[in-house]
Amino acid sequence: MSAPLGLPLAMDSPPMRRGFFRLLCIALLGSSGWAVWASRIDASVPRVVASGREVACTYLAQVNDLPHTARVVHVWIPLAKTGTEQRILTRDIHSPVPYAIAQDPDYGNDILHVALEPPIPVHLEIAIAYRARLLGAEPSRVDPQPTPEELQHALRPSRFMIIDDDVRARTKLAIAGHTTLIARARGIYDYVIHHMAYDKRVPGWGRGDTRRACLLGKGNCTDFHSLFISMARAERILARFKIGVAIPTEASGVIPGYHCWAEFYLPGTGWVPVDASEAWKHPELADYYFGAHDPDRFLLSVGRDIQLVPRQQGEPVNIFFAPYIEVDGQAFNQVQTEVRFKDLNRGGSHESSGAG
């Protein structure tokens, strides 16, 4: 997967297959390893949480064709950390050069940084090997009180997640007749599902550009959730962006791309997950994806317009999934990213199919 300017161009991968949900229903009926609860506000919203699935996951970054005349090369890579979706049991970094780890000041993402000086290698390969327990997501797993920084960033627009008169008008239409915060959030969620199509045939998808989403009504998961977040923030509902991968149900393989989702903040409950693009693909699961996540998400970073550490010379990073690289202060896109996984409770090998 190539990633110019820190933006992954690979397709976002399908989090789950329909067959999984058939198994899920059986598990709900017959296994004590699953728990389900419902909240009735306008409609029942099921939350399903799996007992932890343990996986090995390797994030491989390959930087190619570095110019030997460069004076300095900076490489920043997102690092997974323990959170709502996962518990990181081990995190082993394999790098041929020294590195440092810091947290970005706005979202607290863990960031690996490498600085190269002459002689500059032509190629650089860094691998991060994780062992993680995947938890699924429900609001109770998150601290219900956002920090002042979270409050600030969860309300303001970004370069691509804008709030303009068009977004405000759409939001007003979406929340009409809804009085509670969760009902207004559900109205926005339903609006996005009904006015967007999962369609990557028109160039420009994947940047999370709210204006493009409004004009075309098409895109991938990034575009769906950028529109949701812009509309939520237009209504003064705290909302944030998350990106990582969805680990398939196979025993092992290569994950073909990223997946992203959104969360909004419900006072007294916490951050509530939503996945509008998966709900569009599976309308029968729209209630499920408003308030729950598949227990196969592996999170890499939170937020948009990320300021790296040390700070990059270019613009804030729009989406931080692939490595971001600067050569003598200029963005450099000759990088390949691969994510491999293995279910530690199963054997075998399988390369997952591309996004659909």
Segment roles from a protein language model:
Residues 293-356:
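Low-complexity, Gly/Ser/Thr/Pro-rich intrinsically disordered linker/tail segments
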Residues 104-106, 125-215:
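Acidic low-complexity segments
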Residues 1-15:
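N-terminal Lys/Arg-rich, disordered targeting/topogenic segments
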Residues 184-188, 217-232:
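Active-site nucleophilic cysteine motif
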Residues 75, 188, 262:
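Terminal peptide-recognition signature
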Residues 68, 119-124, 179, 233-235, ...:
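A short, structured loop/turn motif at beta-sheet edges
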Residues 20-137:
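Intrinsically disordered, low-complexity N-terminal segments that are enriched in acidic
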Residues 226-315:
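Hydrophobic/aromatic-rich core segments of domains that either
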